[in-house]
Structure formats: structure tokens, C-alpha cells
A protein has these predicted regions:
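C-terminal-most transmembrane helix of multi-pass membrane proteins
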Residues: 285-286
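Transmembrane alpha-helix interface/packing and boundary motifs in multi-pass membrane proteins
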Residues: 241-246, 267
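Membrane-embedded alpha-helical bundles of polytopic integral membrane proteins
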Residues: 2-8, 12-240
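Acidic, glycine-rich loop-and-beta core segments that form the ion-binding/anion-interacting portion
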Residues: 253
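Juxtamembrane boundary at the C-terminal end of a transmembrane helix
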Residues: 291-299
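Interfacial loop-to-transmembrane junctions
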Residues: 259-282
Length: 299
């Protein structure tokens, strides 16, 4: 998500001459629509590939999430590098890539990998005198924040066999994507009251409510299929809570970007920024959905 507006250069004579013959770009509905179309097209391509992997099965899902986690972790380390943090990037990215693959097996593998990561980083710290504790913290946070958290998508896909498992995992991810889209549309058109202007100036309470409604809509569809032991009240609760945690994930990434002084985590996806920008709500939203479905006896 983009948070920091670009500062405009002063109108020097040379700049005035260079821009004198350039027609002004119309603002308002036209520019909003163009931006929305670009954002939507890129988002649709990303979503189609993602959904295809979820439908094809657990192995394609794990591979896709593994690649996604590696890219997210790389972008995270690139941002923290701007803040002077010198993480062990190879170790961190490797761990981020392996976490979703570990989720293919027993959950004990995830615990074992988490232990191995802590041990490896600890040994690196002991034998690298110039390494600071802040470097260690960032090295640990990168793969846990990305790969470990996103592994919930793989666990969701594997929790229910067959078509129902694909439907559930697609539904959970779709609830966060639709929440993001509804929040963007509502906030762009009628958003007046800012949520956290110092962290994410574009987010509004109106968009926040719109996002919740979008998420609830998808969870109602999941309930209506009757594929799962999901009651109507619990489906509504899941829709609200998952959307809220998705927003919190978005704000956490916005705080990281604001702290290091960047607008986007990368430029991989037009209209969205980097892979981390596109996945920030999934990081906290999917694991929240998994926990709620387990607590509610759905999984």
C-alpha cells in the first residue's frame, strides 16, 4: 500500500520551460478510475495465479506461498537495510522460503524449523562480533513475519481434503482481497475521517467499515455453501475479525515503510507496489482465520 506522497520539485525556470508544453493531467474521476483499473488488473492476475495454485492442491499452494514468502522477506530486509540494520539476509530468506514447505508435513516440522532458525541465528551472533542485537532481531523477524505467518495458508489448504479445502482456502484469501478492494473503493469515494493519518494517510474509517462489509460478504458465501460446520453467527464473526486483523497487518507494514522512509516495499506489482504490499493483510488475516476456524470446531 502506498503511504508517503512524493514531494514536488520547486518550479524553477528550467522546470517551467520543460513542462510548459505538457498538458495538465486531469484529476478527479478520470485519474481515480485509471488508477483503479491498473490496480484491479494487476490484482486480478495475481489472484488468478494464486487461486489456481490453491485449486490444484497442497503442493502447488506450498510452492506458490514459498516463493511469495521469499519475495516478501527480501523486500522486508531491503527496507530495514535503509534503517541501518544489517540482517543475515541469506539465512532469513532461506528460512522464509522453507517455512511454507515445512507446513506440507506434520506441524512438528514448523516447530523444528523455528527452533533451527533460532539456533542458527544465535550461533551467527556468537561467532560474529560485529553483529548487533538489532541485526539479530531483524534477522529473526523477517522470516517469522513473512514465511512463518503465511504458512497458515498452506495449513488451511491442507486442513480439509478435496474441493472443500480449496474452497475454504480461496474463500479466506478472497475475504481479505475483497475487504481491501471495498476499503479502497469506499475510502477513495467517501472517506472523510482518517484512521491513522501519521502512518497511513489514505486509510479512513469509512473505508474500514466498507472493508468489513466486503469480508463479511465472502464469509456469508462460505456459510451458504454448507460445506463446513460453520454457523451463521460464527461466519459473521469471522468476517469481521479477519477483516480487522487484515487491516492491522496492513498498518504494521505501513509503519515499517514510514519508519524507513519508503513509499512501497517494491515495484513488482503495478498499482500495489511490492509483494509485501500485496500480502500485508494476508500475513495476519489468514492465520487469524485458521485459529478462529480451529477454535470454532470447523477444522
Amino acid at each position: 500500500m502506498s503511504d508517503r506522497p512524493k514531494a514536488s520539485a520547486p518550479k524553477t525556470p528550467a522546470r517551467k520551460a520543460a513542462t510548459a508544453g505538457t498538458p495538465a493531467v486531469k484529476s478527479g474521476t478520470g485519474s481515480w478510475l485509471a488508477g483503479f483499473i491498473t490496480r484491479a488488473a494487476a490484482g486480478i492476475v495475481y489472484a488468478v495465479v494464486f487461486i489456481l495454485c490453491l485449486v490444484l492442491g497442497i503442493v502447488p499452494t506450498a510452492i506458490f506461498v514459498s516463493v511469495m514468502s521469499g519475495l516478501c522477506c527480501y523486500e522486508f530486509f531491503r527496507m530495514t537495510r535503509l534503517d541501518g540494520k544489517m540482517a543475515n539476509e541469506r539465512m532469513g530468506i532461506a528460512a522464509a522460503v522453507l517455512f511454507p514447505l515445512s507446513a506440507l508435513g506434520d506441524s512438528m516440522l514448523l516447530n523444528a524449523q523455528l527452533f533451527a532458525l533460532m539456533l542458527a541465528v544465535g550461533i551467527w551472533y556468537v561467532w560474529s562480533p560485529r553483529t548487533r542485537i538489532s541485526d539479530v532481531a531483524v534477522t529473526l523477524m523477517g522470516p517469522i513475519y513473512t514465511g512463518f505467518m503465511l504458512s497458515a495458508i498452506v495449513l488451511l489448504r491442507d486442513a480439509v481434503p478435496g474441493f472443500a479445502g480449496a474452497l475454504l482456502s480461496v474463500g479466506v484469501c478472497a475475504s481479505l482481497w475483497v475487504s481491501d478492494s471495498f476499503a479502497y473503493i469506499v475510502g477513495s469515494r467517501i472517506g472523510k475521517h482518517k484512521m491513522v493519518p501519521k502512518i497511513s494517510p489514505k486509510k479512513s474509517w469509512e473505508g474500514f467499515v466498507g472493508g468489513i462489509l466486503g469480508s463479511v460478504l465472502i464469509w456469508l458465501i462460505l456459510w451458504a455453501t454448507h460445506f463446513f460446520k460453520l454457523s451463521l453467527p460464527y461466519a459473521l464473526l469471522c468476517g469481521v475479525v479477519v477483516s480487522i486483523l487484515g487491516v492491522i497487518g496492513d498498518l504494521i507494514e505501513s509503519r515499517i515503510k514510514r519508519g524507513v522512509g519508503v513509499k512501497d516495499s517494491g515495484n513488482l506489482i503495478p498499482g500495489h507496489g511490492g509483494m509485501l504490499d500485496r500480502s500485508d493483510s494476508l500475513i495476519f488475516g489468514c492465520i487469524t482465520a485458521q485459529l478462529m476456524l480451529m477454535i470454532g470446531g470447523v477444522l
